[in-house]
Amino acid sequence: MDDDIAALVVDNGSGMCKAGFAGDDAPRAVFPSIVGRPRHQGVMVGMGQKDSYVGDEAQSKRGILTLKYPIEHGIVTNWDDMEKIWHHTFYNELRVAPEEHPVLLTEAPLNPKANREKMTQIMFETFNTPAMYVAIQAVLSLYASGRTTGIVMDSGDGVTHTVPIYEGYALPHAILRLDLAGRDLTDYLMKILTERGYSFTTTAEREIVRDIKEKLCYVALDFEQEMATAASSSSLEKSYELPDGQVITIGNERFRCPEALFQPSFLGMESCGIHETTYNSIMKCDVDIRKDLYANTVLSGGTTMYPGIADRMQKEITALAPSTMKIKIIAPPERKYSVWIGGSILASLSTFQQMWISKQEYDESGPSIVHRKCF
């Protein structure tokens, strides 16, 4: 497909929005899912101040803004802001007219029905798209890894899901959701850095801590052993320069932060860790397909980017599973964007073209058409 009629693929994550054209191998635009509003009206006289900023511009002016994320735990909570993000995506990032392109959107598994209806309504009524489709994020990640059967552990900024998929269809009864993801880990890192004497409190400072997390954190293979190493030597210490030039040193926080994925009690949560959640998800599936799921456990999303996470998952799931079971954790290098890549693949398949919801179908049936056509 050439660019002029190419479908648009928009993966709206809680933390980052990934957007581009179907058939491309990577998103053209990746920007934070943030809408910022000035804290004080009219401070910047003559700056042509806008009443709201989106994405990177909001990020760069964060000192004078209050930042809000319209997507929480993978689900849209503020539709006005969400519309701003979509508007920004089409007109500023991709520079396309949405009324000329089919749009593929993504959604969290177990997304409330009203949410997908609202997405559908906004696409057809506000942006006048000729056609659209809503696909489940984890299923797209599996397609991107070249499989149609497997279990996806998808962990982003706002939510973590384990989604077993058989022959291309998600098994809804076995999907498990964990409200513990990147943003919680950033908040936890803010907290444990405060214990070290560094204070990070504002929404702007949270973004600095997110950067520290992304650059320096890793998952320990054996947490207790790593704690002992950190206590007895400075070999694990790293330094980080803050925007104001101050240099901070971070030690065991580097692996204590993502350890919360395996031990949510660190965050005061009673849920199971990602390893147990994955295992529980597999156990909710038919006994005959479990073997295929254990052997095709695919990691996806930005929160699976920590060095060491795949080895640790392998170790933990091996300990839970039957001893003879073959376990394979697949961690594709591009997994940060695998939902988007899967969407790009799906939207450019010739067999997919009859799956789009057309404007005509929407006009006849209304928003509820989405439940009949997207599953």
From Swiss-Prot:
In vertebrates 3 main groups of actin isoforms, alpha, beta and gamma have been identified. The alpha actins are found in muscle tissues and are a major constituent of the contractile apparatus. The beta and gamma actins coexist in most cell types as components of the cytoskeleton and as mediators of internal cell motility. One of its GO terms (cellular component) is focal adhesion. Keywords: Acetylation, ATP-binding, Cytoplasm, Cytoskeleton, Hydrolase, Methylation, Nucleotide-binding, Nucleus, Oxidation. The modification N-acetylmethionine is found at residue 1. The lineage of its organism: Eukaryota, Metazoa, Chordata, Craniata, Vertebrata. This is Actin, cytoplasmic 1. SMART domains: ACTIN. Gene3D superfamilies: 3.30.420.40, Actin, Chain A, domain 4. It holds the Pfam family Actin. Its EC number is 3.6.4.-. Actin is a highly conserved protein that polymerizes to produce filaments that form cross-linked networks in the cytoplasm of cells. Actin exists in both monomeric (G-actin) and polymeric (F-actin) forms, both forms playing key functions, such as cell motility and contraction. In addition to their role in the cytoplasmic cytoskeleton, G- and F-actin also localize in the nucleus, and regulate gene transcription and motility and repair of damaged DNA. The keyword Nucleus applies. InterPro entries: Actin (IPR004000), Actin/actin-like_CS (IPR020902), Actin_CS (IPR004001), ATPase_NBD (IPR043129). PROSITE patterns: ACTINS_1, ACTINS_2, ACTINS_ACT_LIKE. It comes from Xenopus tropicalis (Western clawed frog). Oxidation of Met-44 and Met-47 by MICALs (mical1, mical2 or mical3) to form methionine sulfoxide promotes actin filament depolymerization. Mical1 and mical2 produce the (R)-S-oxide form. The (R)-S-oxide form is reverted by msrb1 and msrb2, which promote actin repolymerization. The modification N-acetylaspartate is found at residue 2. It is found in: Cytoplasm, Cytoskeleton; Nucleus.
